């Protein structure tokens, strides 16, 4: 794998060079403006190309080190592209209204994520049929509301290591929170925006659908390149695989219904930190699709016991769950 290639022609065809009306400009963007045509500012793509490459390299390096990328784009024309790119690259996204404190008050947000998981479990299990129609509707509405806001980050397990933003004016709260926590920000910055405080500025049109689709595709491919590099460092030859790695149900008899991972998300956690887990037991857990503490922390007692039996340590598994919850909380 390698960083995604792109050309200036692609940027031109996507309309990346079109800024806003000249009277709406932010003077701090003057260095990135080529000129004006029909009272519309034209962005200097000769600067956009190297700056985009710099942002792509940062994304790839972050993921290669086991970091998380958070895509942020809540405007209508960015919502689908942001979600698709994040899912395709095994990253995370916010494409509905940004909740204040999503980053700076992660502990509270984690509580809401736990509630979302609880609702999904309640409505998806046999117990869900015990509720009246009205009760079930109320629970579904609560779940849907939480899913709109948190569905894209419910598996994140902690703060992101870099956020990628479409439209810095609209996502100013997200950017402020990231800056407060020292989280790098890569952003598409239009002619009406302020580039101050953005770690990786990419001058470009933040309104055109084709341009947004191009940005999201490039960032997603850079993240996939980072995953490939991380797996290469771990001795996994991605090119030799018969099919691309993807999350699917792990083959198991006793653990039927448990959804494992086909491979780690970034760098796998050291499961040998859990009491009684040797290298051999860790390999058995990996064979079941378990690579991270958060996976164990989320197990219900029945599934946890089945997994304990599968690896030959049923008496230890309750301790693993509590230890994993503690380790996950420490990471957050």
UniProtKB/Swiss-Prot annotation:
Entry GO MF terms: structural constituent of ribosome
CC annotations in GO: cytosolic small ribosomal subunit
GO aspect biological process, one term: translation
Name assigned to this protein: Small ribosomal subunit protein uS2
InterPro entries to which the protein is assigned, alphabetical: Ribosomal_uS2, Ribosomal_uS2_bac/mit/plastid, Ribosomal_uS2_CS, Ribosomal_uS2_flav_dom_sf
CDD domains named in the record: RPS2 (cd01425)
Family under the similarity heading: Belongs to the universal ribosomal protein uS2 family.
Keyword annotations: Ribonucleoprotein, Ribosomal protein
């Amino acid at each position: 794998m390698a960083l995604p290639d792109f050309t200036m022609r692609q940027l031109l065809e996507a309309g990346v060079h079109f800024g806003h009306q000249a009277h709406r400009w932010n003077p701090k963007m003057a260095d990135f403006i080529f000129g004006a045509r029909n009272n519309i500012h034209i962005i200097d793509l000769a600067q956009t190309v190297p700056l985009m490459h710099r942002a792509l390299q940062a994304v790839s390096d972050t993921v290669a080190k086991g970091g998380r990328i958070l895509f942020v784009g809540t405007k209508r024309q960015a919502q689908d592209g942001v979600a698709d790119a994040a899912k395709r690259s095994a990253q995370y996204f916010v494409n509905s209204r940004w909740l204040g404190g999503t980053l700076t008050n992660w502990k509270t947000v984690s509580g809401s994520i736990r509630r979302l998981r609880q609702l999904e479990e309640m409505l998806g299990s046999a117990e869900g049929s015990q509720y009246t129609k009205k009760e079930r509707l109320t629970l579904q509405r609560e779940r849907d509301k939480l899913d709109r806001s948190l569905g894209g980050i419910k598996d994140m397990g902690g703060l992101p290591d870099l956020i990628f933003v479409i439209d810095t004016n609209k996502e100013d709260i997200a950017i402020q929170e990231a800056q407060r926590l020292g989280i790098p920000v890569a952003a598409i910055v239009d002619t009406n925006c302020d580039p101050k405080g953005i770690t990786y500025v990419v001058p470009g049109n933040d309104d055109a659908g084709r341009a947004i689709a191009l940005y999201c595709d490039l960032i997603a491919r850079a993240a996939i390149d980072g995953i490939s590099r991380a797996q290469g460092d771990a001795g996994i030859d991605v090119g030799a695989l018969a099919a691309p790695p993807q999350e699917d149900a792990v083959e198991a008899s006793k653990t039927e219904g448990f959804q494992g991972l086909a491979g780690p998300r970034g760098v796998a956690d050291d499961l040998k930190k859990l009491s009684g887990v040797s290298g051999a037991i860790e390999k058995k857990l990996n064979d079941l699709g378990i690579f991270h503490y958060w996976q164990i922390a989320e197990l219900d007692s029945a599934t946890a016991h089945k997994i304990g039996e599968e690896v030959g340590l049923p008496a230890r598994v309750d301790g693993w769950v509590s230890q994993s919850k503690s380790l996950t909380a420490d990471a957050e």
